[in-house]
Regions:
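Basic, Lys/Arg-enriched alpha-helical interface segments
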Residues: 1-68, 75-81, 89-115
């Protein structure tokens, strides 16, 4: 799978320089995505138990427990994975309030979805 917006993860890595466990976990996520051919949500969760579908089977949060880091990724039918958002758990709570309706509104406000 091809990953777009990888720079978002680059910023997260730069912000957390020295946290080698987190950097290793992010690199493993990148490797897992790039070396996968996931077709269904079940395929994703079989390979990554830290995943949670947050909107319509297209947007997923990966919970990197090493540093309570969350990464939202959109998986498209054409085999492309797009990094949408990444941050600490505190950033997640501040932005999304642990609420799926707030996530949906954020996706809409940032032109990731239309409805």
């Amino acid at each position: 799978m091809e990953i777009t917006n990888k720079y978002i993860l680059g910023r997260l890595i730069k912000k957390n320089r020295g946290n080698f466990k987190l950097i290793k976990a992010i690199q493993k996520l990148i490797d897992d995505i790039e070396n996968s051919n996931w077709k269904t949500p079940h395929d994703i969760s079989d390979n990554r138990p830290d995943v949670d579908s947050v909107y319509g089977g297209k947007f997923y949060f990966f919970n990197i427990n090493v540093h309570r880091t969350l990464i939202m990724i959109e998986f498209e039918d054409n085999g492309e994975a797009t990094i949408v958002w990444a941050g600490s758990h505190d950033d997640y709570e501040l932005t999304f309030k642990n609420n799926r309706n707030v996530i949906k509104k954020w996706l809409r406000d940032n032109n990731w979805i239309k409805t």
